[in-house]
Amino acid sequence: MSSVGDFEEIILHDLKPYYHVPGAIHSEGITFVKETGTLLWVDIFKGEVHKVEDIEQPESSHSFFSISRANYGKNASIEYPPNPDELKESVGCIFPILDGASQNEIKQVLFGSKFGIGKLDFSKSEWEYVILYSECPELSTDRAYKLRSNDGNVSPDGKYIYVGLMSDFPFDLEPIGCLLRVDLLAHKIELVWNCLLIPNAIHWDESDQKTMYVTDSLNFTIWKCPGGDLLKRDELIDVKNSNNQSFESPEPDGSAIWFSKDGKHSGFLFITVWSTSKVQMFDLTNGKLLKEFILPEQTPRVSCCCFVGKDLFVTTANAEINDAVRTNTDKNGGCIYKIPNVLDGNVPLESTKRQPLH
C-alpha cells in the first residue's frame, strides 16, 4: 500500500550525539515519561536499563542498572529459571511504573528480558521476574529458552503488554519468534502471532484505540491490523521499496507514532531503518513516505526513537554487536541523537508509553 513519490530529505550528517554511554553496544527502546521528565532506554546486548532524570543535563543525571543473575531478588516470588548454558540476560523493552514515583524520579520499571517480564526497583538495586514466557501454553520449554524479548508496548487500556520474542544472540536466527500478549493481573500469557523472525515496534491508532500497527522487520513491512485483529492484517508500508532499494537489508526497527491534536492529520509513523542511518516519516492514512532524516553515516544502525515534545530522540547500535572479539573500532554506534523541532506547532509533552496494569 505504501508509495514513494515526492518526499523531503533532511540531511543531518553534522549532527552531534545528544549522549553516548561509554561502551554502549545496542541502545534501544527509548521512552519518555512526562510525569517525571525521565528519559529511559535499554542496552539489549549488555542487559542494561538506563535513565536520565534531567533531559537538559544527561551527563549529571544519567544512571543505569545491569540485569543479571547475580542481582536477582533474594526474596523474589518466582525462582530464577533454569539456565544450563548460563545465557546472558538481555533487555529488549521497558515499561515505566509511576507507583511510588516522586515528582522527578522513576523508581521502578517493568521490562522485557531474556526469560520473561521483569520488574526492577532502582532503590533496592535488585530485580525479579513477574511472569515467565515459558508459562505460555503454546511455547515449548526448549523454544522459549532460545528466545529473548525484543520490542513491546502497552495496550490503550493498560491491560496487556504486547511483546515480541526473537532468537537470542547465541542462536541462529530462525522463524521461531512470536508476538505474545501478557496480562499481568491475570498472570496469563497468550501467543497471538506465531513464526516470526524479528517482531518489532507495536502501536495503536488513536482514533479507535484498537487498530494496531505491527513491525515485521525481516519482511520489511509495517502491518495494519484493523480492530486489533492480527489475523486480518494489511500491508501498510513496504519499507524496502520506500527509497531503500540500494540497501541490502533495510529493516524497519523501533518507531514513534504521532497524532495531531487539531484533527488536521490522521497520524504519522517515524521509523528507524536499521543499516541505513535513516529515520523515515510515513503517513498512516496511505503509507506514503513524507520525509527522510539522514543521520551521520558513522551510525547506520539506527534502532529506535521517541518524541519529547517536538524533538525526536534516536538510539543507535554498535557495529560489533555479535563479534566474539571486540576491536572497539566503532566509537559512535550506541549513541543517542536528538533531532530538534521534528514536529510543528504547539506540541505538548506526552509520555510515549502507558503504564501497564500490574
Swiss-Prot record:
Homology family: Belongs to the SMP-30/CGR1 family.
Superkingdom field: Eukaryota
One Pfam family it belongs to: SGL
Gene3D superfamilies the record matches: TolB, C-terminal domain
Matching PANTHER family: REGUCALCIN
One of the record's GO molecular function terms: calcium ion binding
InterPro entries given in the database record: 6-blade_b-propeller_TolB-like (IPR011042), SGL (IPR013658)
Note: Present with 4190 molecules/cell in log phase SD medium.
Protein name per UniProt: Uncharacterized protein YBR053C
